[in-house]
Amino acid sequence: MKKGIHPNYAEVTAKCSCGNEIKTRSTVGHDLNLDVCGNCHPFYTGKQRDVASGGRVDRFNKRFSIPGSK
């Protein structure tokens, strides 16, 4: 391999807002701050909310439906 053309590959720490620290290696060169990680993400913790917002058809039917009819 040629000398001096490859980026520095060093150990960095990714710190989550929940306090979890993940040690990894990267070419970034400094520690990373994360918003969410596997310990606090709603999908992985089971605290996921089900959003039933509907689609375009539901919005159209709601807007142009006749009051009192089903």
UniProtKB/Swiss-Prot annotation:
Which superkingdom does the taxonomy of this entry point to? Bacteria
Any one Gene Ontology molecular-function term assigned to this protein's record: metal ion binding
- Keywords on record: Metal-binding, Ribonucleoprotein, Ribosomal protein, RNA-binding, rRNA-binding, Zinc
For this protein, the record's SUPFAM superfamilies field holds: L28p-like (SSF143800)
Spell out the Gene3D superfamilies in the cross-references.
Ribosomal protein L31 (4.10.830.30)
On cofactor binding, the record's note says: Binds 1 zinc ion per subunit.
Q: Which residues bind Zn(2+)?
A: 16, 18, 37, 40
Co-factor requirement: Zn(2+)
Determine if Zinc is one of this entry's keywords. Answer: yes
* GO cellular component, as recorded: ribonucleoprotein complex; ribosome
* PROSITE patterns with a match to the protein in the record: RIBOSOMAL_L31
Some GO term, biological process aspect, for this entry: which one? translation
**PANTHER family, sorted:** 50S RIBOSOMAL PROTEIN L31, CHLOROPLASTIC, LARGE RIBOSOMAL SUBUNIT PROTEIN BL31A
- Identify its protein family: Belongs to the bacterial ribosomal protein bL31 family. Type A subfamily.
| Quaternary data | Part of the 50S ribosomal subunit.
User: Tell me, what does this protein do in biology?
Assistant: Binds the 23S rRNA.
Q: What is this protein called?
A: Large ribosomal subunit protein bL31
